């Protein structure tokens, strides 16, 4: 029990290669389907969910970062992404917001100033002390976001934050 924090990345996978679709004749969506689309749907065991040709893609979601009791970073998400609502909901995080968090963490580390990212009190949220665990959580956040920004598909990903406590 405690504050668990998750960042997931989602990507839309097209089902249809529109360049291969013969629109002059009878439309055959199966012949224009990207093979990886069917592989993804089958790997997820969802092939029976989609039963018509009106579905043109799927969203794939992967957990890409996890924090445990890094309440200062959670506080940042609550105030900057969740509009002050600390409700364990799932919230969209734009690339700009991730870059803003990255810069805030870097500033805090460079100045050794916790005023940039203040800890948040909460039931089972962990320590409020500004100690090595606090700075380790900030450093870990920098490492995770920098890793994500270096992905070739960074601009094509949608990110979502959710906490559990």
What is each of the regions a protein language model found here?
Residues 1-165:
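Acidic (Asp/Glu-rich) sequence patches and key acidic residues
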């Amino acid at each position: 029990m405690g504050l668990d924090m998750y960042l997931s990345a989602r990507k839309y996978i097209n089902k249809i290669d529109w360049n291969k679709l013969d629109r002059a004749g009878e439309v055959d969506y199966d012949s224009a389907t990207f093979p990886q689309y069917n592989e993804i749907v089958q790997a997820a065991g969802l092939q029976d969910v989609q039963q018509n040709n009106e579905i043109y893609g799927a969203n794939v979601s992967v957990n890409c970062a996890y924090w445990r009791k890094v309440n200062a970073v959670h506080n940042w998400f609550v105030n900057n992404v969740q509009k002050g609502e600390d409700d364990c909901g799932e919230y969209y995080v734009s690339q700009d917001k991730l870059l803003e968090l990255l810069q805030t963490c870097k500033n805090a580390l460079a100045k050794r100033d916790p005023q940039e990212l203040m800890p948040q009190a909460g039931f089972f949220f962990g320590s409020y002390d500004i100690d090595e665990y606090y700075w380790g959580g900030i450093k870990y956040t920098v490492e995770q976001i920098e890793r994500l920004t270096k992905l070739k598909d960074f601009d094509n990903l949608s990110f979502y934050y959710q906490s559990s406590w």
